């Protein structure tokens, strides 16, 4: 019995919780070797019995049998895929239908958000927001997809009155870093935490007495060790990916939370500036 095919084709027959389970299994089939029903239930916010019943609905005796069957099917499909299909992104291949691709992408992003939010230390987050709010100058560093996240945050912060530099050129990033002063803040965005350009800038900022805030993964890294504060992000993407999709989703959830927290801290003035910005841009239409 091909359980993966059965799961893909039975979408309309599933309840809301069953669809959660189906989406999780499809998006994480390559990781099932290390997933238990207890972990899965906790992550999805459902009972273990719901997972067992789902497995039985598909014809398996329980979750263990379903899990092992899915692992076997995935391994077999990988061997076939190596010869017939292209590996496009994470667990997505050129043989997947658009519906399956959509489900895999959506679940990948949902998991990144859920796991990242579950890690938040809100007392520490509040402290970080207060530190940023008092900074005379803010530098944001990042490369590739992380640079896009940083650029978005810089626009948001400038809208509510903060002096921000977010340069794409790494030489300029380094130049700005060495000119930071005590009280200034550098927000370094790097999922790996090991990009030499970002680490170099963090070292320079710290040497000048600036506060370094890293938005990075849980992995031990040079950036994590340099930072005064860290904001953790989790992404379920495999090493092979066409683009940092769920990583950017996780990073954006952190930067958006920082922005809204800063708006809340100085709500009256921030809202006035947001309104003025909106009025000005409306005049350009």
Swiss-Prot record:
Residue ranges occupied by any SIS domain in the UniProt entry: 128-268
GO biological process assignments: carbohydrate derivative metabolic process; N-acetylmuramic acid catabolic process; negative regulation of DNA-templated transcription; regulation of carbohydrate catabolic process
PANTHER family per record: GLUCOKINASE, HTH-TYPE TRANSCRIPTIONAL REGULATOR MURR
CDD domains: SIS_RpiR (cd05013)
DNA-binding region: 37-56
Keyword set includes Magnesium: no
InterPro entries assigned to the protein according to its UniProt record, in alphabetical order: Homeodomain-like_sf (IPR009057), HTH_RpiR (IPR000281), RpiR-like (IPR047640), RpiR-like_SIS (IPR035472), SIS_dom (IPR001347), SIS_dom_sf (IPR046348), Tscrpt_reg_HTH_MurR (IPR022821), WH-like_DNA-bd_sf (IPR036388)
GO molecular function annotations of the record: carbohydrate derivative binding; DNA binding; DNA-binding transcription factor activity
The protein, known as: HTH-type transcriptional regulator MurR
Physiological role: Represses the expression of the murPQ operon involved in the uptake and degradation of N-acetylmuramic acid (MurNAc). Binds to two adjacent inverted repeats within the operator region. MurNAc 6-phosphate, the substrate of MurQ, is the specific inducer that weakens binding of MurR to the operator.
């Amino acid at each position: 019995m091909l359980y993966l095919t059965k799961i893909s084709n039975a979408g309309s027959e599933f309840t809301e919780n069953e669809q959660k389970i189906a989406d999780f299994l499809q998006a994480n089939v390559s990781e099932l070797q290390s997933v238990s029903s207890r972990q899965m239930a906790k992550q999805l916010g459902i009972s273990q019995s719901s997972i067992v019943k789902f497995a039985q609905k598909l014809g398996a005796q329980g979750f263990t049998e379903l899990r092992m069957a899915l692992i076997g099917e995935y391994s077999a499909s990988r061997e076939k895929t190596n010869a017939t299909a292209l590996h496009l992104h994470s667990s997505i291949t050129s043989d997947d239908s658009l519906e399956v691709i959509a489900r895999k992408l959506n679940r990948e992003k949902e998991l990144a958000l859920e796991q990242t939010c579950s890690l938040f230390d809100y007392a520490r987050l509040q402290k970080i927001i207060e530190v940023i709010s008092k900074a005379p100058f803010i530098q944001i560093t990042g490369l590739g997809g992380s640079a896009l996240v940083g650029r978005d945050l810089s626009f948001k912060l400038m809208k509510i009155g903060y002096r921000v530099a977010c340069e794409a050129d790494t030489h300029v990033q380094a130049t700005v870093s060495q000119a930071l002063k005590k009280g200034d803040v550098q927000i370094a965005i790097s999922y790996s935490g090991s990009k030499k350009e970002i680490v170099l800038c963090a070292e320079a900022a710290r040497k000048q007495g600036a506060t370094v805030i890293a938005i990075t993964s849980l992995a031990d890294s040079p950036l994590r060790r340099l930072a005064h504060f860290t904001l953790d992000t989790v992404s379920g993407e495999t090493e092979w990916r066409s683009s940092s999709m769920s990583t950017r989703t996780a990073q954006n959830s952190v930067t958006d939370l920082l922005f809204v927290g800063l708006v809340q801290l100085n709500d009256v003035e921030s809202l006035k500036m947001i309104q003025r910005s909106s009025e000005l841009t409306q005049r350009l239409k």
